[in-house]
Regions:
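Membrane-proximal intracellular helices of multi-pass ion channels
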Residues: 1-445
């Protein structure tokens, strides 16, 4: 009897499942956007433009090659909004939500994947956390839509209901897509509402709330104002977020927006400090801002929001850990510390790896686009920071880019959204060494 060799079935890691899930949804979204019914002119959208839009929506970026309000039909806008919602929550979280609603049990493998997707500290309680994520998301998005309703209904009638819901979800998911462009005025974002305190404040609040992370909101809802009982990660996120909101606002107020009334300057300064992390809306002409302000926005874009949130970027915790490690080095301390707790050395290593990967993609992408399009490097750096950090801000070059440059941005948006460590672990797997090589010192600095 002939015995055939038995092949071991390949098991995908949690990180590979996350990337495959995003890629599959991205492709389906692109195909839906290619249908003539998706556009107002009932035309077939080229695949590369549909893929760019689908990737931008799913990766909650906001960069567009076609104006969302004037080019896409209600069907197309609905597809974009669905992609934004899936991308904001995460493909795995949405899949788990459907499984829970259908009464199916979540396997151990699925729980492990959900843990990685939500940046949860442990697998226990992951199903309960998923339910909390869905509830808090619905609460903020519906509350935001209700607050935006009077403004949009006053300007657009019954269509304002759709506008309020769309912009609320887009803001909380840190997407930056808007429906306010027309044939005569495309890619205007929220500039017409720059002097509207209600709309700008609500949108800014939704952006910040979405970017804090669901674990942070779990601490806030559980312990209320008892800050000392929060987990260290939540404390770091809240303090770092406050730091990254207040200081840029003061800079913009003092050095960028120096004309107009105090209220106008406050609204402009506040909103432009919020939106780079990582929403993509704007209430000012970004191309008209000074070079130092644009450079500051690039830094804010790269830093991004917080882990386990709807935002992208390197994350506030990465920035905070690198600062803490630098401070420990200055003081000749062995360990970086936060709030009376020692930071694990693997966290410092991961932070340095993520920062290095994002900066490499940021510069390399800009170099390719600048070479292909013959554009100034500074403009391309702004564009690639916006893409890899899934922000959506632009100095106006996105619609004019060629297919190669659009492909670069698609890759940056996708890589930026799935996360630095997710990409690394999916590509290289985990193979712990059973032996260690001899150690030798090397001079640094």
């Amino acid at each position: 009897m002939i015995q055939y060799p038995r092949y071991k079935r390949h098991r995908f890691s949690s990180f590979q499942v996350i990337i495959a899930g995003f890629a599959a949804v991205d492709l389906v979204g692109a195909l839906l956007l290619m249908f003539p019914i998706a556009t107002q002119q009932r035309c077939v959208t080229p695949f590369h433009e549909a893929l760019f839009t689908s990737t931008s929506a799913l990766c909650v970026t906001g960069l567009v090659v076609q104006d969302t309000g004037s080019y896409w039909s209600v069907f197309g806008q609905s597809v974009i909004l669905l992609l934004i919602q899936i991308g904001g929550l995460g493909v795995i979280t949405v899949g788990a939500a459907f499984a829970l609603l259908s009464g199916r049990k979540i396997s151990l493998k699925q729980r492990s994947t959900m843990q990685e997707a939500t940046a949860a500290p442990q697998m226990g309680g992951i199903v309960r956390l998923t339910g909390f994520i869905l509830r808090i998301t619905a609460l903020f998005e519906l509350a935001g839509a209700a607050l935006l309703l009077p403004t949009f209904c006053a300007d657009y009638g019954l269509r304002g209901i759709w506008y309020a819901l769309f912009h609320s979800i887009s803001a909380f998911c840190n997407a930056g897509f808007d429906l306010l462009g027309t044939e005569g005025a495309k890619f205007v974002s929220l500039t017409q509402y720059a002097d509207n305190p209600l709309l700008t404040t609500v949108i800014a609040a939704l952006i910040v709330f979405g970017g804090l992370g669901f674990l942070t909101w779990e601490d806030i809802c559980t312990y209320r104002l008892d800050f000392h009982r929060y987990r260290m990660q939540s404390k770091v996120i809240l303090v770092t977020t406050a730091f990254l909101l207040v200081l840029p606002s003061l800079y913009f107020y003092c050095f960028e927006f120096t004309a107009g009334s105090a209220r106008q300057r406050i609204l402009l300064s506040m909103f432009q400090s919020v939106t780079p992390r990582t929403a993509g809306f704007n209430t000012a002409d970004l191309a008209a801002m000074g070079s130092p302000s644009q450079a500051l926005m690039v830094v804010l874009m790269l830093l991004g929001g917080s882990p386990g949130s709807t935002a992208g970027g390197m994350k506030t915790t990465t920035f905070a850990v690198l600062l803490a490690n630098m401070w420990a080095t200055f003081r000749r301390r062995e360990d970086a510390e936060f709030f009376g707790r020692r930071i694990d050395s693997s966290a410092v290593k991961n932070a340095a790896t993520i920062a290095g990967m994002y900066l490499t993609l940021f510069f390399l992408g800009a170099f390719v686009i600048a070479t292909a399009e013959q554009l100034p490097m500074s403009v391309c750096l702004y564009e690639t920071a916006s893409a890899v950090a899934t922000v959506g801000l632009t100095l106006g070059i996105t619609p004019q880019l060629g297919i190669l440059s659009q492909g670069v941005l698609i890759a940056l948006m996708f890589l930026g959204r799935v996360g630095g460590l997710t990409l690394i672990y999916a590509a290289f797997g985990s193979s712990p060494a059973h032996s260690r090589l001899p150690q030798e010192k090397i001079a640094i600095g």
